[in-house]
From Swiss-Prot:
Not known, part of the enterotoxin complex. The lineage of its organism: Bacteria, Bacillati, Bacillota, Bacilli, Bacillales. This is 48 kDa protein. It comes from the Bacteria. It comes from Bacillus cereus.
Length: 15
């Protein structure tokens, strides 16, 4: 993955 993928994971946790 890339750095963008890390942001996606954060969004999921946030949700």
């Amino acid at each position: 993955x890339t750095q963008q993928e890390g942001m996606d994971i954060s969004s999921s946790l946030x949700k």
